[in-house]
């Protein structure tokens, strides 16, 4: 039986998910696309300010989640 546990950690500099606005009123299609591309570039730069910790959190969570599975396989191998 698998048990999943979710933990929340405050990460300085991380503001959550960015919501994309649909429809640029008063702008042409190409103008809206240029602005959206420019915003994405800024958002990726903003994410890097938090350092390497936001990149490590999903890896640590995956490793913690894999521990029960690894332990059960080890126990089964030990029994056989």
UniProtKB/Swiss-Prot annotation:
Site (Cleavage): 32-33, 51-52
PTM comment: Cleaved by the viral protease during virion maturation to form the mature protein.
Region of interest: Disordered: 18-45
One example GO MF annotation: DNA binding
Positions of the pro-segment in this chain: 2-32, 52-80
Assembly and binders: Interacts with the core-capsid bridging protein; this interaction bridges the virus core to the capsid.
Protein name listed in UniProt: Pre-core protein X
């Amino acid at each position: 039986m698998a048990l999943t546990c979710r933990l929340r950690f405050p990460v300085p500099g991380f503001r959550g998910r960015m919501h994309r606005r649909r429809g640029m009123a008063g702008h042409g299609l190409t103008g809206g696309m240029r602005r959206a591309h420019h915003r994405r570039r800024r958002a990726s730069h903003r994410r890097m300010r938090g350092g390497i910790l936001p990149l490590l959190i999903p890896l640590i969570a995956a490793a913690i989640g894999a521990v029960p599975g690894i332990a059960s396989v080890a126990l089964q191998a030990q029994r056989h």
